[in-house]
């Protein structure tokens, strides 16, 4: 326990703290340098780094690194430290954050819906953990982030849906802020670019892929979680496990209360909040 505490404290000061004081470009260079120094401990080293302009969105850039034998793309330079130990390790970190092992127990889902998949690390880890899974669907509407997830998952069988999830199928206004992973239907703080994206309901996604239960859903809709759950009616009994990030992304207000209410309406039980923003639930089907 003492070693773990020392390691965590050292990690915070060496890797995480500098992000608060350095501009993005210098922080990236710093982490690339640090990864070389600690590679003998973690067996990880950022071998190459490049920064790529995004077509149609010249104000944004994509970062690309080579760690070991794998290449990873991501949209925020301040997140580079997440990938020092590889893409699967980053996915496992997210898996733990969403308490997936806790809600699954010894069960194995028939399919996984990753709603708000970002650059795909959660889906990627799921594909490793459950190699025989019938389908994993990664849903992501942000066109900048999509370039990353398409690259990161290109060697997998994971299906990528370039849409948003809402309470209706329509073309809707969407506010783009990929560098902080805050792109949303709800205007985020700071500068954001207004675009239009295709939105679909969870019902329509489940039906498109002919998913059968039991389904595991991981959801992070940047404040749009209640509307996403509204679009789940015909197929709600196919979903057995769900884990939702209900953080304060809706004008600074958490959606936890609305999320719990919707889950109860859909017949979920064992609804549990973890920390400030993770809500998990299980349904007997």
What function would you assign to each model-found segment?
Residues 109-110, 127, 132-137, 156-158, ...:
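Conserved acidic-Pro-Pro-aromatic motif
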Residues 118, 142, 166, 224:
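Conserved glycine-rich SAM-binding loop
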Residues 147-148, 170-172, 250-255:
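Short, charged, surface-exposed secondary-structure boundary motifs
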Residues 116, 164, 220:
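The conserved acidic donor/metal-binding loop of glycosyltransferases
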Residues 1-139, 147-148, 255-259, 266-285:
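S-adenosyl-L-methionine
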Residues 123, 146, 168, 225-227:
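Short, well-ordered alpha-helical microsegments
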Residues 68-104, 163-209:
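Glycine-rich adenosyl-binding loop in Rossmann-like folds that engage adenosine-containing cofactors
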Residues 148-158:
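Short, conserved SAM-binding/catalytic segment
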């Amino acid at each position: 326990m003492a070693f773990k505490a020392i390691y965590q404290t050292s990690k915070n000061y060496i890797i995480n703290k500098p992000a608060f004081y350095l501009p993005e470009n210098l922080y990236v260079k710093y982490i690339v340098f640090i990864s070389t120094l600690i590679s003998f401990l973690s067996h990880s080293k950022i071998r190459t780094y490049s920064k790529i302009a995004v077509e149609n969105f010249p104000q944004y850039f994509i970062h690309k690194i080579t760690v070991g034998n794998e290449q990873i793309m991501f949209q925020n330079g301040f997140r580079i430290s997440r990938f020092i130990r590889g893409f699967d390790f980053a996915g496992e970190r997210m898996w733990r954050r969403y308490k997936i092992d806790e809600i699954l127990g010894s069960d194995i889902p028939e399919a996984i819906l990753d709603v708000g998949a970002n650059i795909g690390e959660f889906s990627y880890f799921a594909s490793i953990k459950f190699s025989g899974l019938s389908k994993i669907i990664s849903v992501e509407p942000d066109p900048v982030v999509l370039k990353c997830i398409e690259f990161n998952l290109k060697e997998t069988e994971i299906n990528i849906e370039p849409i948003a999830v809402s309470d209706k199928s329509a073309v809707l206004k969407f506010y783009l802020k990929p560098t902080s992973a805050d792109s949303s239907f709800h205007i985020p703080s700071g500068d954001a670019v207004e675009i239009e994206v295709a939105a679909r309901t969870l019902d329509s996604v489940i039906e498109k892929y002919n998913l059968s239960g039991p389904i595991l859903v991981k959801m992070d809709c940047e404040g749009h979680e209640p509307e996403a759950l509204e679009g789940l009616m015909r197929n709600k009994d196919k979903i057995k496990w769900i884990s939702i990030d209900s953080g304060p992304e809706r004008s600074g207000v958490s959606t936890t209360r609305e999320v719990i209410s919707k889950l109860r309406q859909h017949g979920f039980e064992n609804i549990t909040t973890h920390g400030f923003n993770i809500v998990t639930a299980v349904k007997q089907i």
